[in-house]
Amino acid sequence: MKQTIASIIILMSLLVSCKKDDFSYPDSKIWAHRVNDTTMAIEKSKKFIGLEVDAIYSEYQDEIFVGHNIEDTSNGLTLDTWFNAVEKPSEKYFWIDFKNLDSKNADKVADIICSIMESKEMEDNLFVESYDTKALKIVKKHNLRVILWTENLQWNKVDTVTWITDTRRMIEELEPDALSNEDAMYGLLIEHFPEQNIHLWQKTPKTHKEENIKRTHELCRNKSVKAVLVDYDQPLAIENTGK
């Protein structure tokens, strides 16, 4: 009887962890990190297939601005203007890291993004990232892809068992298109959620040091890992990456 119950629990766990890989990812898993101005957008979009940009929604102006912090909105760079600088946006892939997405502004954010995608003739090549599951559920209703940023054990004092339980609960609630975190969480993510699409931010200097390149290769070769954000000036040529 105990074995039967244990088997059921394991099966339920696997079902929760499963996620259909129905997104058509590009061949290159190496995406440019924090492309937060138009100059970078022009340069990086010529070299990288995928770009990550930080975004902040301004309720006062009902507009999405590019920036990592609230004060960055003073630069006045809207997400729409940023996309104008990207070379052939319909042929690229985008990871939008929303810093203040919540259930109150999620509908407006999604409407703006959908409008941008339509004007740029973009189709299913963009992800919206946040840690707020309620907000992401709203964004999903607009047929947009979502990335769930999981809690980072390197930053917060949470035990591993609690992290696994909480993450599994959020996956079940949201059914995200991918999970994300910095590369320090790589081991836990691929061990406990191997069926999920995993997006990682590799915290490395811009230089192509041997240890940095080795780490990039390691991350990209895992089939669960679909995108790795780097600060290199250009992508690396990595062969035999798992799909």
PLM regions with names:
Residues C18-K243:
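Phosphate-group recognition and catalysis centered on beta-loop-alpha active-site segments
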